[in-house]
């Protein structure tokens, strides 16, 4: 038998090699590329000048110092939320993070109580958000926000429109707040500060909670606490209402109910008629959504998520994120009570 590959096999091998080389070249080319060389960046600069009155020379100078990074594109294609629940939960709901949350709550009890009084959002939710996002303000991200947003706006077609909008919001934000756009650090997605607000959220929902005249989510814990609470209030958090409940499912309609999504759609009492029973008391008229959380072995854990669960997903659209926040907050509250 001949040991030489067939002609089709050779063609396939050559194509694979070309793809590999071109992929590596793309990664190499993108790293440290100066985006101002791209025509779409010049179009963006034109828009910022015409629409918002920015100085063209200043923007050209700033974009000449921006460096695009392949690692940013790589990171956004591998978010933690792509993991199954049984791998995701142990990242965030840990004894260390619970203890740190108790300590944070005790240190900032006055601000948390004031935030609850003003916005209706309980301390455990605010604390858990800050715990999941930045380990209570310790890890803000190691990327220049200008690099991150420019990379995603001009080299990540899947979400280019969104990040182009966030880059616009970022330049407006830094102008309004008197910040150097090339000096601000954040996440690979351009989220900033203790609360990891993206630029549009910072402009719309950040508050000066301590009254010092600045909205500072990097160094001012009071502002971070107040801003998270304001974000939840503005997204229709219902004070005193439950977040959700574990559920017992004895229905052959599970697939259909799960396909309805995470936005509450059916009253609890109607779901009960369809074989889905909350294991904790819930208002019978409250709309709910059935959500499954994958276990390593066996059937998933089923939960009914109510309005406040959905509100948590407005901070991060993943139900895994919302459940991690809820469970971390409950664990912190329980341990603090003991």
Tell me what each language-model feature is.
Residues 2-12:
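Bacterial N-terminal signal peptides that target proteins for export
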Residues 145-154, 192-207, 228:
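Substrate-binding/active-site groove segments that recognize
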Residues 209-217:
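Acidic, glycine-anchored loop motifs typical of Ca2+
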Residues 68-75, 134-144, 155-160, 176-182, ...:
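Secretory-pathway/luminal and periplasmic proteins that interact with or process carbohydrate-rich
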Residues 11-22:
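Bacterial N-terminal signal peptides
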Residues 59-68, 122-137, 170-172, 228-229:
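Short, functionally critical alpha-helical segments immediately adjacent to catalytic or ligand/cofactor-binding
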Residues 28-116:
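An acidic, Gly/Ser/Thr/Pro-rich helix-cap/linker signature
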Residues 250-338:
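C-terminal soluble interaction/assembly domains
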């Amino acid at each position: 038998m001949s040991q030489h590959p067939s002609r089709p096999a050779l063609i396939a091998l050559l194509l694979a090699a070309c793809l590999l080389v071109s992929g590596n070249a793309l990664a190499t080319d993108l790293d440290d590329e100066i985006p101002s060389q791209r025509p779409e960046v010049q179009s963006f600069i034109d828009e910022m000048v015409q629409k918002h009155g920015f100085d063209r020379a200043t923007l050209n100078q700033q974009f000449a110092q921006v460096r695009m990074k392949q690692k940013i594109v790589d990171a956004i294609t591998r978010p933690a939320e792509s993991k199954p629940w049984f791998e995701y939960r142990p990242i965030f709901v840990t004894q260390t993070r619970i203890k740190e949350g108790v300590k944070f709550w005790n240190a900032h009890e006055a601000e948390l109580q004031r935030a609850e009084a003003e916005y209706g959002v309980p301390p455990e939710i605010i604390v858990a958000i800050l715990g999941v996002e930045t380990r209570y303000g310790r890890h803000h991200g190691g990327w220049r926000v200008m690099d991150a947003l420019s990379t995603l706006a001009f080299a990540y077609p899947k979400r280019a429109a969104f990040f182009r909008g966030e880059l616009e919001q970022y330049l407006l934000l830094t102008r309004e707040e008197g910040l150097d756009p090339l000096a601000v650090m954040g996440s690979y997605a351009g989220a900033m500060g203790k609360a990891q607000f993206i630029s549009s959220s910072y402009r719309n929902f950040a508050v000066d909670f301590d009254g010092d005249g600045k909205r500072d989510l990097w160094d001012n814990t009071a502002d971070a606490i107040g801003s998270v609470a304001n974000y939840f209030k503005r997204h229709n958090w219902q004070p005193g209402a439950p977040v959700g409940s574990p559920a017992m499912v004895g229905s052959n309609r599970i697939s259909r109910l799960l396909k309805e999504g995470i936005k509450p759609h059916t009253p609890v009492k109607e779901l009960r008629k369809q074989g889905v029973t909350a294991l904790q008391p819930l208002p019978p008229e409250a709309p709910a959504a059935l959500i499954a959380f994958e276990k390593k072995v066996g059937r998933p854990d089923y939960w009914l998520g109510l309005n406040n669960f959905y509100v948590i997903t407005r901070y991060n659209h993943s139900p895994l994120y919302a459940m991690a926040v809820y469970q971390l907050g409950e664990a912190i509250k329980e341990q603090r009570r003991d």
